[in-house]
């Protein structure tokens, strides 16, 4: 807090910003940091910026486009473009169409970081909770009109070994498990 040089900025679609203000930063669950100034008093500690689904916005020179995905609560995947390379992040999602269609339109799509939380034996749980399995991922990738690298993320720790084994069994050399301690360059 004392080292912040500006407010922490949270970007989100209207529904997400509303829910964060109503249910988290409400002085019951967590302080309303939009009302707490930085130590120098210049600005609030926290700032929300509402963005529109499908409409690019800029952060630090990057064009970011939020795309709604299929999840029990409002969630967006992100297309992030620096003018030379596009990366896609599904966020929490189950089977979805628009995200893959929009990602596939990006001429410089280099990688997709995709939620693969459960093994295929837990397909019913994955569907109810809005996440992919290796099997559903393989079916989803057919929708992608590009062949970027695919990095599996958000693997539930209890199922990590099974998910990794199943991803390997897919035999797709473009798919790997993202490493938390690795920096990726594209």
Segments the model singles out, each with a brief description of its role:
Residues 6, 37-47, 60, 146, ...:
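A short helix-to-beta-strand connector/capping loop
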Residues 12, 48-50, 66, 152, ...:
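Structural signal for conserved beta-strand scaffold positions within catalytic alpha/beta enzyme cores
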